[in-house]
Amino acid sequence: MNAKERMAQAMRGRTPDRTPLMCQFSLGYLAKNFAGDLIRFWYTPEGLAEAYIAAAETYHFDGILVSISGRDPTLPQQIQHVGEGEHGGKIVSWKNGSWSFIPSNDFPQDHSGVPETKKPSFIEELDLDSISRVRAEALPGWTFNILEPILQEKGRELSIHGEVGTGFEQFLGLFDKLEDGLMALIDDEGKAKEALRRLNQNVLVYAREQCRRGIDALKLSSPYAGAGFLSRRMYQEFVLPYEQELIETVHREYGIPCYIHTCGAIGDRLDLMLQTGTDGLECLDPPPLGTVELKEASLLLGPNAFIKGN
């Protein structure tokens, strides 16, 4: 049984020859430990793809979660100059006059000098037409140029997973602050649900395109759906139906497992998360970070869902 087969067995509720091993490292960790060149790592598709593969080989992982699927290949051509920054970082000057500081172990910090467009604070300020419809045929050709070479090089031996951010995560991102998005759910439930519907249709496009390329599983990133943000009732209203639609579509059209990543306080809603049809759950945080005890969760979930570490 190879790694790909091992993961497939575990994700489908069967017994593999041993417990599979894989982990999603932070991009900062990958940059610090597997990026020979920070510019290549952050601004070329090859750099990040190589780091994903190197990490999996170093730690003998059974799978790779590709959390960033593509990178604009013209970015290096837009660089004017690269200088040395503090603590091993880099300072990038761009031809458009902006600049970025790249720490050795964290995301680039971009400084354009142009004030950011203010996002709405209230749902009445939200223009639904600003949620542009995503069409697969209109996606840039490079949208999956990190995922594709990983599938080509490691897809026969390792379990390769794709990822989408859920509609609810993106909905909160439409507003100036997270709390503004949460208040919007109360202030105008109908408008919020229409925004979620439109966003979920766009998420489906990215999910389908990754599935079509041959991923073995799809992760739904839903970090704000725990009790620290939403009650059970609001979860049922604003999260469950949209994640259920996404998972049912992937199951029906591609037959691959899906799993949900929600951090923190989810001990009160594991039963609701199962109602999405998910095949697995990721990130069962114990107290004090979360509200889930692994033993209790295992008994509740039973054979209905696999448990995956983060």
What are these regions (language model features)?
Residues V66-Q80, G165-F168:
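Short, glycine/charge-rich beta-strand/loop segments that flank catalytic centers
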Residues L48-S67, E209-D216:
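Catalytic domains of carbohydrate-active enzymes, especially glycoside hydrolases
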Residues A55-T58, Q80-G85, I150-K154:
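Short, charge-rich binding segments
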Residues P45:
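Aromatic-acidic/polar surface patches that form glycan- and anion
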Residues M1-W42, A51, V114-N310:
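Active-site loop segments of alpha/beta catalytic cores
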Residues P73-I131, E157:
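A contiguous, low-structure linker/loop signature
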